[in-house]
């Protein structure tokens, strides 16, 4: 019997890095609502009293970026100066240029088309950059996500809910969770440690906060059978968390990549997700790789599946596809690659088409994870390839 501990974290929408991600995706959605052929690479920085939105955007429409940024911060809950950040009085600075023509020429006309080798219309669109992207799925939870990150996200969603619904009216927007799960022979058996840090009003008694967070946030979220008398709880372990949000830390887009994906259980290619239109394979191929891995696991071809796909800038066809099933595969990993090539088109244009990615759907996934979202209907979470994979694999 092999036992090990594994830990993942999540952050609330009021965390400074997530404010930045959410603003970047709100800008993308606002543009896509008017021009779904736009090229968007939007980055954001938030600090004390300041929002800076910068990037390369090519579009025929007009979007009031400062207004989008302020409304996003308002939705999060930073509406008063005493919270450390105020959507109405903070400065908003923008620095926007068009997409580099050197990049655009590779996206607009893929290598295959330039060489006269394009097989169809999909190969007119090249990848927006080089790089490798990973997708992952596991059978250990109903949403096919690792349990540590699934529970960590559930805790931060609940933390935001009890604040917004005024169940715990003394909470403020910034917050984090961390969950350590004990595994026995690869299966989760218990929760070992729960960490919650939440911004709060300065006059609240810490003992009261800890008791109420335990009863209204942790216990309703984590299944009772996963908790025992050895489970440890650290709730605001420093003893005070009044200064938070951009006043406490500078936030940047792309700083919470592991929170956005699989909580460290799978590898990561290094590319951020938020603020990018789907011609950027950092985003679209990461979604496609999750789509592939989830369908492989749901089809019973493996209990765990990690898919890597890689691209060259300006080239439509992936330069490589690889699979790792960690010894859980019902068929060989080589056979899985063959099945993936047969049933999934991983060229950027095909990913955008098949997952219907030219829509304003991105702000919703900018917080609480891009994958395994039972609260959202996401195209990359569909299980529409299961039967075909099973049939082709002979299961």
Swiss-Prot record:
Classification via CDD domains: S-AdoMet_synt
UniProt: Mg(2+) binding residues: 17
Annotated GO MF terms: ATP binding; magnesium ion binding; methionine adenosyltransferase activity
Binding site for K(+): 43
Subcellular localization, as worded in the UniProt entry: Cytoplasm
Top EC class, one word: transferase
Pathway the protein acts in: Amino-acid biosynthesis; S-adenosyl-L-methionine biosynthesis; S-adenosyl-L-methionine from L-methionine: step 1/1
Superkingdom of this protein's organism: Bacteria
Keyword Magnesium part of the UniProt annotation: yes
Protein name: S-adenosylmethionine synthase
Organism: Moorella thermoacetica (strain ATCC 39073 / JCM 9320)
Organism phylogeny: Bacteria, Bacillati, Bacillota, Clostridia, Moorellales
